[in-house]
């Protein structure tokens, strides 16, 4: 016999979506917010020559700048008010999360529930403003050194231009931070992830057209194009398979008698995903590495010689960059998994509800067992995230494809799509349950 939830899920169709007015409002709000974000990626900073910027980024589309531009939805290549995108906010969130594991004061705030969470969010916003201002000043200073055959990138360089750029870029990041929070609260899906997702999706058509053009002109052979297409499809299928994989730990509940009736005695399971951390580790790793490397790359031409050497040493496809990126992904996979799943708390909740894992004593033994299983799953998940993020990158650098179309972007697109679709299905299921409850109440009233 199918469960009630399975029967409801089987009945989900367009008619059920048409009746879910709340879901429709949330989707419209989400689409509207993302449209506003996309419009902002076309508003240029004051005082720059966009033609010069376009020439510079056209020459460096296959490097770190092209990779960051992909995450920014093309805003960096057009040098718009959203050029920094949401990356300073992500970096600040990483620093605060690491602080909760190191600093006792932040750790105490984390334990204080809703009030502590609000305080941590406030610190994250302060950190976002500081990081965005520092990075914006670095970009402004770097822009003043950009030259092309048509002239300089900055029309009137100086302190006024730098301060104006800092205000505009910092304000753009703050607005995106607020917009992401609004999408999460009033829309569908995680707002920050959807902003990054929409930026990548907006740049993919241009990347595909450029690839086909390279094939048409003979820069890339037909065989290489086929390899790239097959690789992309294979990576997508692999991501979907792994993201749906989970280890189910059997949980049993003892029988208990209430009056003359027996309750409990049933078996359930505790699902542990193979990749508990989701898409967060690659996003965190990209945020930590891309912003400083991009700043170094933008200032390398006008700085000391060692800065140029560092920019080349940390360039995309270089062993040092690959090693740092892989180490960051593995670290954030274990770190974020420990944030979202606490074996001790889970074991304590099972014990309070009378549940136990067969063959494992409740309490500390169950917590140790869950931690053991989770560590092994996280190790495999970290290898999976590293492979998906780096193996396509190695192939692309080998074939010299001049733009970023690697595994990280595919991972973000596929994972965010799956999470958002799952949330839509959850809203539809909740709407169907509400309909069933209303019908049962009406029948009871008639009787």
Where are these regions (language model features)?
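N-terminal cationic and glycine-rich segments that engage phosphates or anionic surfaces
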Residues: 2-110, 115-447
